[in-house]
Design a protein with these regions (language model features):
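Active-site loop-to-helix "anion-binding N-cap" substructures in soluble metabolic enzymes
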Residues: 1-154
């Protein structure tokens, strides 16, 4: 039965000229039919260079949002609309705005694993591989790194 469903998805994907991107933590049945597998940033970069105009993002909401930001001309489908990342939901844009108003001397650095709304109110967005280099390049000493405290501590 699962194989039948996978076959139907593959058939529809071909008919619609779509591409399936899957985050590496997806289940094996999804990874088996994915065209590309990777982390959130890798998949966003892959999507940008694809010829297909329809991208099916098997991951969480911020990943689909990031794909759409980097490829605004593409149709991006998130199969499970309520798929969220607990880390991406740890802080709201309103909290960041309030913090920045109370502490204008701070620069707010957001990890890529955040919502589009949160990225929009931050000063810079980084990946795990670019975080250290970018933070070191910020002349201000006061930096709030959100939402990954482990990466921020590094």
């Amino acid at each position: 039965m699962l194989r039948d469903l996978q076959d139907e998805i593959i058939k529809l994907k071909q008919e619609k000229q779509a591409v399936i991107l899957a985050h590496s933590y997806q289940s094996a049945d999804i990874l088996e039919i994915a065209d590309y597998i990777g982390d959130s940033y890798q998949l966003s970069v892959v999507a940008k260079d694809l010829q297909q105009s329809t991208v099916i993002m098997c991951g969480v909401r911020f990943m689909a949002e990031t794909v759409k930001m980097l490829s605004p001309e593409k149709t991006v489908i998130l199969p499970v609309k309520q798929a969220t990342c607990p880390m991406a939901e740890q802080i709201s844009p309103e909290q960041v705005i309030s913090f920045k108003q109370a502490h204008p001397e701070f620069k707010v650095v957001a990890y890529i694993n955040t919502t589009t709304a949160l990225k929009a109110v931050c000063d810079v967005c980084v990946t795990s591989s670019s975080a250290l280099k970018i933070v070191k390049a910020i002349p201000e000493q006061n930096i709030l790194f959100i939402p990954d405290k482990n990466l921020g501590t590094y």
